[in-house]
Amino acid sequence: MAPTQPQTKVRKPPRSWDALTPPLAQWILDYLSSMGFTQPTPVQKSCLELFRGNKDVVVEAVTGSGKTLAFLIPVVEKLLRGEEPAKRNHVQGIIISPTRELATQIYNVLVSLVKFHEPSAEAISHAKSDEKRPTATQPVVVPQLLVGGTTKAAEDLGTFLRLSPNLLIGTPGRLAELLSSAYVKAPASTFEVLIMDEADRLLDMGFANELNRILGYLPKQRRTGLFSASLSDAVERLITVGLLYPHKITVRVKSLKDGGIIQERKTPMSLQMSYLVTPASQKMPAIVQLLEKLEPRPQRSIIFFSSCMAVKYFSRILGAVLPAGFSVTSLHGKLEPKVREKNYERFVNTTSPMVLLTTDLAARGLDIPQVDLVIQHDPPTDTKVFIHRCGRAGRAGRRGLAVVLLQPGREEGYVQLLEVRQTPITPLEKPAISVTPDEVERVSAAFRSQALADREIFQMAQLAFVSWTRSYIEHQASSIFRIADLDWLDLAKGYGLLELPKMPEVREAKIDRSLGLGINTEEIPFKDKVREKKRQEELAKWKEEKAKRAQEENTGDKRKKNEAWSGKAEQEETKLQRREKKRRKREAKKFSEMTEKEKEEHLKLEQMIEEVRKRNEAKAAEERAAALAANPPKPKAPVKKVDDSDEEFGGFDD
């Protein structure tokens, strides 16, 4: 009989999913395989080892490191490990997110995961039914999404009672509101786990009160996971209140700097972060070249702007100059929730090259797959946001490029500032970008022609430029981003302006607001015939009132020649009051005839201009006070008072 050969034990790769202890369920491995995730990221490996072992965790990891699965897998395992299903209307887990987009994204990832767990997939299939979900015979994961803008609070409660979910995912306000209902129960005997995702942003957005309310509804004996890209003092205080003896997980990426020095990076190695120095008028032509020349051609690109109005404006006009095959969509905080959701889904699911124009709304948390290119048209006012903007590309090991556009001069100092903050960026070398004067004129002319054809676009351009100026003034790195160093004419060309807005900065610079174009902007019509008809009627009234005022003033001038000096000051004051009253009346009437959108934009513009005016007045007052302190006026010589009390007139002599 041949001797039995000893069996060779197959060793599993140390970084594979199979190597985790305890091992993952087979259905979870099937999901990971179907998604192409061959091995866990460092944050996933560290988190799964601790969080699955009944320990609270605080996870600080770079953007795009795979935090979502790092907490979803342990949460699902905790909810399924019981012997019996959760009682009806009893919540076992909660995931808090700062924005509806991020909450929706987490919900969708969770649904795609638990579809591989047959009992949970069967339970979730009843989500769209009007009848109550049948009671499960074994533990399942049934999530409910709670975000504002799509449903009302009463509808959320109705869905909860019908579906009986055991895992809630949503924004702080909606979660706190649902938990306040007597029908929603989260006792210590049932509740398992709380997740706070993007915790620093939750606090930055002012959700501290809602978080405290939520914590008040939950038992202290629970597992808690706090996930964030950075840990601020406010987050540390939240950790003290919300977690018991947490284990801190910090995942850094290290790269070799010139000279062989190892330095920490706050972004994945797969992400290249670069800068391009270019005048304002060349920014858009440079973006067009970047999209044309980048190999392979970017499928999904994101361009960040400093304001909602800039996103709104450029999303209307940029399509005219983009390379063939590219489309444009937008995402910002002023959009209706349903429009935001539609645009987000359109960008995520696009099958052709698309450019998303957005504000810092999309800078954090949104895990948009396969973003190839991020361009920062405007550097963020808060340098901490820079890294999160860049992190939209190069996620989950995919190669990505992030480029920030800087104007020549002081703005180039932004590179050194980022290096000090452990966010080094390098000059963009590939693809080589070289913009000619002809390209600048072509792009600017394309923008201006659209503004000439539609007054709505002309007005958008004015509002966008004012809001950009406001954000530039408020930049934290004010020594680098100085309003006094700006080339207003070059900026106007970059925005495709037909005239500069009425702003104190433009007035102080003593620039011709017409830009030498010789365009009468009052004659630019609305494409919408109804709006144009209304505008013409208002314009006719205004001209009539102006002529009437001029006639009244002319008549008044003639009367002045024959008037006595006495009483003129009082008459002038009365006239000014009457004139101001008429002006306010006209403004009120004009405002009342505006659409809600026009009213909102008008108020924004007035508020912006007023804030800028106040700041400039305050600055001027400080400068006058400083000048007065440096050169105080000489004191005047005292006037000697003559005492003539003894020389009182006593009458004439006889």
Swiss-Prot record:
Keywords, in A-Z order: ATP-binding, Coiled coil, Helicase, Hydrolase, Nucleotide-binding, Nucleus, Ribosome biogenesis, RNA-binding, rRNA processing
Pfam families: CTE_SPB4, CTT_SPB4, DEAD, Helicase_C
Reactions that this protein is recorded to catalyse: ATP + H2O = ADP + phosphate + H(+)
Positions with biased composition (Basic and acidic residues): 542-577, 589-625
Entry's Gene Ontology BP terms: assembly of large subunit precursor of preribosome; maturation of LSU-rRNA
Gene Ontology annotations for the cellular component aspect, listed alphabetically: 90S preribosome; nucleolus; nucleoplasm; preribosome, large subunit precursor
Region span, Disordered: 542-654
Coiled coil in keyword set: yes
Localization in the cell: Nucleus, Nucleolus
MF terms in GO: ATP binding; ATP hydrolysis activity; RNA binding; RNA helicase activity
EC assignment: 3.6.4.13
Residue ranges annotated as motif DEAD box: 197-200
Domain annotation Helicase ATP-binding: ranges: 48-249
Motif (Q motif): 17-45
Biased amino acid composition, Acidic residues: 644-654
Basic residues bias spans: 578-588
Enzyme class: hydrolase
InterPro entries: CTT_SPB4, DEAD/DEAH_box_helicase_dom, Helicase_ATP-bd, Helicase_C-like, P-loop_NTPase, RNA-helicase_DEAD-box_CS, RNA_helicase_DEAD_Q_motif, SPB4-like_CTE
Function: ATP-binding RNA helicase involved in the biogenesis of 60S ribosomal subunits. Binds 90S pre-ribosomal particles and dissociates from pre-60S ribosomal particles after processing of 27SB pre-rRNA. Required for the normal formation of 18S rRNA through the processing of pre-rRNAs at sites A0, A1 and A2, and the normal formation of 25S and 5.8S rRNAs through the processing of pre-rRNAs at sites C1 and C2.
Domain notes for this protein: The Q motif is unique to and characteristic of the DEAD box family of RNA helicases and controls ATP binding and hydrolysis.
Similarity annotation: Belongs to the DEAD box helicase family. DDX55/SPB4 subfamily.
Subunit structure: Component of pre-60S ribosomal complexes.
Descriptive protein name: ATP-dependent rRNA helicase spb-4
Organism: Neurospora crassa (strain ATCC 24698 / 74-OR23-1A / CBS 708.71 / DSM 1257 / FGSC 987)
Gene transcribed to yield this protein: spb-4
